[in-house]
Each structure stands twice: as C-alpha cells, then as structure tokens.
Amino acid sequence: MTEKINLLNLSEPELQGFIASQGQPLYRATQLLQWIHQRGVTDFSLMTDLSKPFRQQLSEASFVRVPELALERVSADGTHKWLFRLADNNKIETVFIPDRKRGTLCVSSQVGCALNCSFCATGKEGFNRNLTLAEIIGQVWLAARLLKSPYKITNVVMMGMGEPLLNYEAVVAAMHLMMHDHAYGLSKYRVTLSTSGVIPAMRRLREESPVSLAVSLHAPNDALRNVLIPLNKKYSLDQLIPLCRDYYSRGSKRCVTFEYVMIEGMNDRLIDAKQLIRLLADVPCKINLIPFNSFQGTAYRCSTESAISVFQKCLMDAGFNTRVRRTRGDDIAGACGQLAGQFHDRTGRHQRWVQKQGHDFNRPIPAIDH
C-alpha cells in the first residue's frame, strides 16, 4: 500500500506533480492551495468546489497535518509565543509581534540550532534536526488560525529557532508559499530571511528567491565575531561583506539589513561603532541595533540606554540608516535570542552547557487554556 502524503509538505511544483499523478488538471493544485492556506481547511470533505470522487481520491492518497499547539503565552505588550508539538514530540517556538498596523510572525527553521552563537539561548539548547516544509509553513498556518481580531500577519521573518540557510530547500519552499497569491499573498518585501552568514547558500538564495535579507553581524571585526558567531571562523567578514555589498543590484533600491546585538562592554563602545562604519563604508544597508535579551546562565549583559544612544548617533552621523529595535515579549522569553523550545539535543551541547553552569535552564512554559 502506498504511504499517504502530507500535502502541507509539498512545494507548489510538487503539489502540481501530485495532482498530475492523480489524473487531475493542474488548476486543482491552485484550488487546494486556496482551501488549505487561505481558508484553513484540512478536511477534504469540506472542499466543496472539488468533485466528490476527487475528494475521496484525495483522502485515500493524502492528508493535511500541521503541528499541534502545546502551550501559549501572551506578553503584557501583546506579543504571543506558541510552543508547537511536532509529530516526533519535539517542540518548537513561534512568536507573533503586533505593532500598530503590522503584525510580524517570527518563524523557526530548525529544532534547536545547528550553530552555537554565544549570545543566543537557542544555541545553548543544542540541535536535533531540520524542520520539514510542513513544519515551517505549518507555523504560519497555525498562527493565522490562532490569532484573534484585530491581529493579522502582515510580515514573516525567518528569525526563530535555527539557521534558515542550513535548511535551504524547506525554508525557500515555505517562503515561496508565504508569497504565493493563492496561499498567504505576502510581498517579497514582507518576508525576511535572517542568516548568520552561510556564504554558499546566500549566493544561491540571491539567484532563487526575492525575499528580503537580514544578516546577523553583531561585531565589527573577525576576532570578536569569532567569539559571538563561531560560523565566522569558516565564513569570515572578508567573504561576507562583499557579498552583502552586491547582494541587490544598485538600481533596485533594496539593501541588506544588518542586525547588531548590543552587549555591554563587548561590542558597544565608540571604537566599535567607528570600526563598524569603516567595515560597512560602501555597503548599501540598514542597521538594526538590538538590545541584548538575557537568558539564564549567560554572563552577557545588555548595553545601557546611554551606550546604545551614543552608538546609534555615531552611525547615523556617518550616514547609516540606524534604528534601535524595541524589545518585545521579553517577559515571556519570546524576545530576540531567547527562544528555546523543548526537544532532544542530539549534539550533547545542552548537557555540556548545563554541566558548565551547574543548572538546567530548559524553562517550563505555563499554559493558556484553549
């Protein structure tokens, strides 16, 4: 007996291939996209513009399965954090950040993270595996259903758990669905992928996907970046910065956004700002300064408001479009760098971290009843 297929795990070309294999015209793929993603219907019997024989055919050959909601927390500022349970019982976190006329969904790409950035809670939890397409787009599907009016997803950022470009195929396929007119219909300007700098995958992404790019920079030189982002030892700034400079054509008016976490006494001095100015001198870019969000066991501390203000002014005086990202959801451990999830670490990294600190920092998350 042929194993049933989860339609949520198919890219648009794969869905069209599945439809063709069922002897159906290709427009059926469009209908299924609309039913599943726009209307949120997973029961084939309710897809009323499909013939009854085809609905029966679908139920025999396929299904639609999304992750399950395990827990939810809502911040005092309106930020939502969800813990989603996967089929293998690993759990990931997804965050929704409302802000005036926009609502940003922060989506995870891995169970844990394959990288081990020193300032990020996710990295300390270790790594289990890449998420499937169904598990990535399923976060968007679930969030759209869970949010109550007036909340609405207007932007998606691949900035949750994991390094997106180490899960390239599934992430790019998911972003394509986010932008598809018959799925979520988001503009390419409203879907952003954030990377720590996986150079080969960045080059490929530039050719294959029109999404906006953000780069986790966090340091103005290799010596410091090697400490904060160990990946820099493989892909250093002399490779990363030229690629960012030429990532978008000069005539497009688009540019890379650099993310820079502000850590007291480490990368927040005036000398660091001046070094950053020299590093990015000819790079069309925007800079987001991110106040460091603490997590249990870290020795890092957030820069003072005064230090952040001086750093920002120095960059702006040099002509850089620089903003300070407002911290959201930190009271529910939903802010940048705080996501942890609950999963089996296959690397042993979390246990080594626990032994080093003398505590287990895998935080329990109180539930909200549904």
From Swiss-Prot:
Pfam families: Radical_SAM, RlmN_N. One of its GO terms (biological process) is rRNA base methylation. One of its GO terms (molecular function) is rRNA (adenine(2503)-C2-)-methyltransferase activity. Its EC number is 2.1.1.192. Gene3D superfamilies: 1.10.150.530, Aldolase class I. One of its GO terms (cellular component) is cytoplasm. InterPro entries: Aldolase_TIM, Methyltransferase_A, RlmN_N, RNA_MTrfase_RlmN, rRNA_lsu_MTrfase_RlmN/Cfr, rSAM. It is an enzyme of class 2 (transferase). It catalyses: adenosine(2503) in 23S rRNA + 2 reduced [2Fe-2S]-[ferredoxin] + 2 S-adenosyl-L-methionine = 2-methyladenosine(2503) in 23S rRNA + 5'-deoxyadenosine + L-methionine + 2 oxidized [2Fe-2S]-[ferredoxin] + S-adenosyl-L-homocysteine; adenosine(37) in tRNA + 2 reduced [2Fe-2S]-[ferredoxin] + 2 S-adenosyl-L-methionine = 2-methyladenosine(37) in tRNA + 5'-deoxyadenosine + L-methionine + 2 oxidized [2Fe-2S]-[ferredoxin] + S-adenosyl-L-homocysteine. The active site is at E93, C336. Binds 1 [4Fe-4S] cluster. The cluster is coordinated with 3 cysteines and an exchangeable S-adenosyl-L-methionine. CDD domains: Radical_SAM. Specifically methylates position 2 of adenine 2503 in 23S rRNA and position 2 of adenine 37 in tRNAs. m2A2503 modification seems to play a crucial role in the proofreading step occurring at the peptidyl transferase center and thus would serve to optimize ribosomal fidelity. This is Dual-specificity RNA methyltransferase RlmN. It comes from Coxiella burnetii (strain RSA 493 / Nine Mile phase I).
